[in-house]
A protein has these predicted regions:
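N-terminal subdomain of nucleotide-sugar transferases
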Residues: 1-64, 248, 410-413
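Conserved donor-binding/catalytic core segment of Leloir-type glycosyltransferases
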Residues: 4, 220-236, 241-245, 256, ...
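Membrane-proximal helix-turn-helix segments that form the acceptor-binding/catalytic region
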Residues: 93-103, 115-118, 122-126, 152-174
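Carbohydrate-associated surface elements
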Residues: 178, 199
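Nucleotide-sugar-dependent
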Residues: 236, 286-293, 298-322, 329-338
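Nucleotide-activated donor-binding/catalytic signature segment of Leloir-type glycosyltransferases, i.e.
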Residues: 250-252, 258, 265-292
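A short, well-ordered alpha-helix in the C-terminal region of glycosyltransferases
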Residues: 356, 363, 370-384, 396
């Protein structure tokens, strides 16, 4: 099976979409697929092209058997909304043009921004091939959830376009059951929806002793470390976390933030203004280095802003943390909270509730029996959400449906 996969993010970028796409495609190649990735020059989240790459019309490379074609796009930091829209639109157009010359049996496009799916839909019409909408986020609802834009004519148009693309997709693969329920409630045929969640890469992430060199380098020996590794974006509510840290007088607790994003500078400035001593900010690290830094963490902090839309998401940090037996302090409601509580893999606090967060931190630090029970829960969670197993499920689902779709698909778009 020849797969054309269109994605805005791909390694060496190391956010959740890039990681999932790479790991899935890598597994599909082992199952006999020929995969071509259509993406842009790596630049997330700073909007700066990574060393060794250029923002050219076409770039070709091979990454562990995956054919990667990079096309030009308007590049900007993950900050201002209108500039990001230009980024998305330019990549949609460039990927469409490049896709015209790539042979495939099926076309897959992944969100969260769905302009990649416009490219996939257009290619499917012209090339008469089935296409899959991989749904990572309910966009544009998530735009409003972080106050990037208020409801108006633009959001109405985006909502119409979103629903149109769901209906036109041959298959929709959402990452959560909540996404599936949302689609069904909006009239999308349940029979063409298959949930494939994110999962744990058990080959990269596994339980291990704390990395003593990293502890020494950061001068954090003997500290109870609460770690956040990932995007410092508008959705994560890290300003709330920093404000809460300023009210914690336990000097043995230390907070470690690793990553970058639209809010990174703001929360660093906030911590300096408040003269917080028990906090460390580090620049982004490559994916292969994450396990070493995660090893020194006692608690994995996973917050999001308080919003109904975030009740539908499952942060990928859950699966990396569970694979390394790191109990989680989760500030997310909805399906993510259900998973953590069902597996007893962490403690949940109400998003943006300072007193609840502080209380749960103390509980995790001082209740050793609870901590060990949560570690056992992490092991069970990671085993059930094995990334390889989920990648194979997705490939099998696509394979089983593609031949039938080829026979019956008649485009009337």
């Amino acid at each position: 099976m020849k797969v054309l996969f269109i994605t805005d993010n791909f390694p060496p970028e190391f956010n959740a979409p890039a990681t999932r796409t790479f790991e899935h495609c890598n597994e599909w190649i082992k199952l006999g697929a020929k995969v071509t990735i259509l993406t842009c020059a790596p630049n997330f989240p700073q909007g700066k092209v990574y060393k060794g790459y250029k923002n050219k019309i076409f770039q070709f490379e091979k990454l562990q058997g995956i054919r990667v074609i990079r096309v030009w796009s308007y590049i900007t930091a993950n900050e201002k909304f209108l500039k990001r829209i230009l980024d998305y639109l330019s990549f949609s157009l460039s990927s469409f043009i490049a896709g015209l010359f790539i042979k495939s049996d099926i076309i897959i496009a992944t969100s969260p921004q769905f302009f990649t799916t416009i490219s996939a839909f257009s290619l499917s019409v012209l090339k008469r091939k089935p296409w899959i909408f991989e749904l990572r986020d309910l966009w544009p609802d998530s735009i409003m959830a972080v106050n990037a834009m208020k409801y108006g004519i633009v959001i109405k148009c985006l909502n119409y376009l979103e629903l149109f693309l769901y209906k036109k997709a041959t298959m929709v693969i959402p990452l959560t059951m909540a996404f599936k329920e949302n689609l069904i409630n909006r009239g999308i045929d349940e029979n063409k929806i298959k949930v494939i969640t994110n999962g744990s890469n058990l080959e990269l992430f596994s339980p291990r002793l704390k990395n003593l060199k990293i502890l020494d380098d950061l001068k954090l020996n003997g500290k109870f470390i609460i770690g956040y590794i990932g995007t410092h974006g508008m959705a994560h509510g890290l300003d709330f976390i920093v404000n809460t840290i300023s009210k914690i007088d336990d000097t043995d607790m230390h907070f470690l933030f690793i990553g970058d994003g639209a809010k990174k500078r703001e929360i660093e400035d906030l911590a300096k203004k408040m003269k917080i001593k028990n906090i460390t900010f580090l620049d982004p690290i490559c994916k292969d280095d994450v396990p070493g830094y995660l090893s020194i963490v006692d608690i994995s902090l996973i917050p999001l802003k308080k919003s109904d839309i975030f009740k539908t998401v499952i942060p990928s940090k859950i699966f990396e943390s569970s694979a390394m037996k790191k109990p989680m302090l989760l500030g997310v409601e909805g399906q993510a909270k259900d998973i953590i509580e069902d597996y007893n893999a962490g403690i949940c606090f109400e998003p943006e509730n300072e007193s609840d967060l502080i209380e749960k931190l103390k509980l995790l630090k001082y209740n050793k029996n609870l901590y060990e029970d949560l570690q056992d829960g992490c092991t069970r969670l990671a085993a059930d959400y094995n990334r390889i197993k989920l990648a194979r499920q997705m490939y099998q689902y696509i394979s089983n449906n593609i031949s039938n779709e080829k026979k019956r698909i008649t485009y009337t778009n």
